[in-house]
């Protein structure tokens, strides 16, 4: 291929053209035969393959009566189908509502209700469960089995809707740390800016290979990684589900140069016995939440990874902080991505700036119009609560050093992070409170075994009626009906009384300090 061929999306510097539909059509027109996605244990797609298949899906949706502005909810784990429905929804100007396929019960019901979609497109393996949930609760929603939806016809490219910079094109649900999970409404510019952050801060080019093993129903997998590849011509290597045992082999086999990982993945990799093949790969960039100093050192020295880039962000605010190439992270988040964002540490009660070196709340706002969420779907009160005094309040505690580096300290909100997922303590508690003999519940994080980088385990303290004899296995099984697999507690504790504030709020900080006590029951089935 001619060395002068330009693979980077031509309008990357012009926000007016930050639209997924336009990106796909331009890239498929200029580079139709470039192999852009490889599904491990599956097919390989060119830009043209991607476009044609997405236009076929768009025709299916059009035949079902979808029109610009409608919401379409998908409950799909298969990355091939997920990607095609995502692009098809962009082609028609729809609002793509992506649900985490691990959720179930009341949490799933809440998310389907709030999305206000006429149809939920469900992967075959989940169809019976979701269909039953919808019918049982008399929702005015139709569930469609994705396996039964096919079309040889496609809409014409002239029918593709590009939309505007400000159009909401995606909804992803994030943990409701003090209430139900919230649907983050994401405009075109916000989605594309995730990808631009990766391109600019990772120096991503067409000759690179990006390994994606994180779920596409999160912004990390779909926008930071996949969309960044689509905009640059870098090849996306997709494993449908993370496999700890296959991670290193995949990195070597597919000549991976870039990847994003979670803390738990990093902890697994560095815990493997040293091997003479540890540097036998082409991996040059790892993007991750800040790693402790020792795992980062091991990646750099033992595995020879040139850049281990820390970053800080969330679905609502994009990635406003990146580590710098050729710089040791040392557990820090990096510096502000000043081209597009402002970040300050402020007093969480007074909303005023505080001095460098002091702990306060991390607050963010965009410089790029619509480079942020537009709000929480159906929850205007929550939008106002987090976005006040012209700053988004992340609920995270942090420090800004005089050098301009930011340090993440802890979560102000009662959010638990496990297996790469943010878990709402509220939703875990509600799953137990539905059990008739449970009177009070408090879910909180306990450090996982394995040291730094292993994230959290879920612990739930419970109060029960005095005359009840507890069988912990039955208790877990009852709660599981309304819990995602990653939300199932490892530890349960029955208490006679909770520590509480004067206003009656459970003091979870005291429960966390007590940790795993002698009267704690451990779930050995997770």
Give the positions of each predicted feature.
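N-lobe entry segment of adenylate-forming
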Residues: 1-45, 49-64, 68, 92, ...
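Conserved pre-ATP/AMP-binding loop-to-beta segment of ANL
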Residues: 32-33, 155-173, 180, 203-209
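Conserved AMP-binding/adenylate-forming
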Residues: 41-43, 58-106, 422
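Conserved AMP-binding A3 loop
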Residues: 46-48, 169-193
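Conserved structural elements of the adenylate-forming
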Residues: 51-59, 184-205, 213, 223, ...
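Conserved AMP-binding/adenylation subdomain of ANL enzymes
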Residues: 93, 192-209, 217-257, 272
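AMP-binding/adenylate-forming catalytic core of the ANL superfamily
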Residues: 103, 110, 120, 364-369, ...
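Gly/Ser/Thr-rich phosphate-binding loop
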Residues: 231, 248, 253-261, 270-330, ...
């Amino acid at each position: 291929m001619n060395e002068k061929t330009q693979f980077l999306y031509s309008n990357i510097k012009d926000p007016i053209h930050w639209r997924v539909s336009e990106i796909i059509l331009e890239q498929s027109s200029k580079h139709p035969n470039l192999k852009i996605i490889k599904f491990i244990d599956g097919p390989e797609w060119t830009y043209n393959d991607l476009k044609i298949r997405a236009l076929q899906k768009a025709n299916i949706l059009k035949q079902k009566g979808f029109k610009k502005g409608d919401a379409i909810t998908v409950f799909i784990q298969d990355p091939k189908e997920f990607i095609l429905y995502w692009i098809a929804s962009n082609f028609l100007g729809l609002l793509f509502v992506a649900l985490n396929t691990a959720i179930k019960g009341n949490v799933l019901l809440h998310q389907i209700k709030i999305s206000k979609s006429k149809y939920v497109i469900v992967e075959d393996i989940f169809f019976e469960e979701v269909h039953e949930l919808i019918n049982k609760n008399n929702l005015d929603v139709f569930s469609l089995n994705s396996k039964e939806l096919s079309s040889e016809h496609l809409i014409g490219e002239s029918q593709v809707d590009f939309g505007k910079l400000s159009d909401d094109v995606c909804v992803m649900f994030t943990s409701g740390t003090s209430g139900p999970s919230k649907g983050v409404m994401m405009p075109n510019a916000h989605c594309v800016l995730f990808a631009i952050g990766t391109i600019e801060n990772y120096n991503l080019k067409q000759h690179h290979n990006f390994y994606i093993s994180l779920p596409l129903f999160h912004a990390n997998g779909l926008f930071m990684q996949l969309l960044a590849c689509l905009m640059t011509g870098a090849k996306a290597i997709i494993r449908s589900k993370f496999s700890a045992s296959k991670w290193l082999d995949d990195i070597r086999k597919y000549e991976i140069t870039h990847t994003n990982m979670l803390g738990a993945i990093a902890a697994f990799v560095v815990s493997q016995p040293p091997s003479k093949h540890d540097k036998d790969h082409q991996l040059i960039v790892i993007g991750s939440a800040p790693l402790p100093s020792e795992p980062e050192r091991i990646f750099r020295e033992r595995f020879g990874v040139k850049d281990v880039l820390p970053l800080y962000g969330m679905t609502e605010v994009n990635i406003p902080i990146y580590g710098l190439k050729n710089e040791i992270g040392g557990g820090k988040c990096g510096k502000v991505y000043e081209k597009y964002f402002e970040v300050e540490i402020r007093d969480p009660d007074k909303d005023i700036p505080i001095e460098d070196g002091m702990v306060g709340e991390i607050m963010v706002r965009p410089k790029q119009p619509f480079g942020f969420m537009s709000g929480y779907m159906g929850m205007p009160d929550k939008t106002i609560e987090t976005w006040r005094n012209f700053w988004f309040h992340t609920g995270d505690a942090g420090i800004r050093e005089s050098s301009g580096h930011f340090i993440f300290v802890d979560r102000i909100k009662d959010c638990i992070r496990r297996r790469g997922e943010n878990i709402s303590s509220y939703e875990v508690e509600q799953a137990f409170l539905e059990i008739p003999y449970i009177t009070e519940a408090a879910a909180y994080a306990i450090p996982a075994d394995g040291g730094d980088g292993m994230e959290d385990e879920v612990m739930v303290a419970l109060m029960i009626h005095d005359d009840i004899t507890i069988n912990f296995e039955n208790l877990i099984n009852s709660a599981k009906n309304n819990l995602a697999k990653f939300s199932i507690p490892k530890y349960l504790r029955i208490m006679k009384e909770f520590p509480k504030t004067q206003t009656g709020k459970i003091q979870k900080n005291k429960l966390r300090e007590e940790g795993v006590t002698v009267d704690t029951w451990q779930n050995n089935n997770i």
